[in-house]
């Protein structure tokens, strides 16, 4: 059950939506950068990229440690993709245009 809770439950590392403001109340989220650092340490990671919580565009949260990349492309009207190349971050739009938006 610990494995399930860690990876598959509503509050798991994979499905947790409490990082995003519109879900703060339903998840009773009160996260800090320190909380995010603990999760990243557990995962031995620098960032978490989430693709299941639709935003208007790619968003970065908690000092660029969390990326929300589901920008509504599934609706066929808008959308962006995240491309990471040579440690640089780009937004790709439906027209194929790449825009650098963050440097590491």
Regions found by a protein language model. Name each.
Residues 1-104:
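Feature recognizes metal-dependent phosphohydrolase scaffolds
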């Amino acid at each position: 059950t610990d494995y399930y809770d860690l990876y598959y439950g509503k509050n798991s590392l994979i499905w947790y939506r409490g990082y995003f403001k519109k879900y703060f109340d339903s998840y009773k989220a009160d996260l800090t950068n320190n909380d995010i650092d603990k999760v990243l340490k557990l995962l031995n990671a620098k960032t978490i990229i989430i693709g299941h919580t639709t935003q208007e565009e790619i968003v970065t949260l908690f000092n660029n440690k969390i990326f929300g990349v589901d920008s509504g492309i599934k609706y066929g009207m808008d959308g962006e993709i995240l491309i990471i190349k040579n440690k640089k971050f780009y937004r790709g739009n439906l027209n194929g245009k790449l825009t650098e938006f963050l440097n590491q």
